């Protein structure tokens, strides 16, 4: 559907942003046995849940809920990131807004890449510069925490696809959404 919309964080998708639309479509059309999708739960957003259930019908066993790290799980998730994840013996990288203070997550989490705060123009005007940037981020057996709004889906798809081509199948790329915003930005952006 080619219409202008603005999301909860103020990112506006214009009708002429065909690069964004194509890259988002590629990310949802991608299929691999180890590639999972997170969708809204029925109680949070019934129309979107139904849309994604239909869209992902062929890989429904690879679908989970995108609110896995929020609501009643948010405190557990934040505690895991801030303390327990230090013991994983894996590199953990953060990809997110240039305004996020990722150092508050702990010195065991490294910065992989920043995204302009409203990165839609970046992807609209310079999609290949963005793709070149992500293609240099391949550490074996690493965990990538991605909090880049709607660009997270595109970044994760690209990292996973290129990682597989490099036989780097053991890395995990996780869209953490806004689940750590109160730490990264010192403010609550959602009511979990």
Give residue ranges: language-model regions.
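Electropositive, gly/pro-rich neighborhoods at or near active sites that engage anionic ligands
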Residues: 1-105
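A short, acidic, amphipathic alpha-helical segment used as a generic capping/interface helix at domain edges
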Residues: 19-23, 123-137, 151-153
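Residues at the C-termini of beta-strands that transition into short coil/loop
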Residues: 41, 112-115, 177
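Gly/Ser/Thr-rich loops at beta-strand to alpha-helix junctions
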Residues: 42-45, 97-101, 145-155, 180
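A short acidic (Asp/Glu
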Residues: 48-50, 103-105, 152-160, 184-187
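Redox- and metal-dependent alpha/beta enzyme cores, enriched for Fe-S-associated oxidoreductases
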Residues: 85-133
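Structural motif
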Residues: 91, 142-143
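Short, flexible loop segments at boundaries between secondary-structure elements
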Residues: 118-122, 166-192
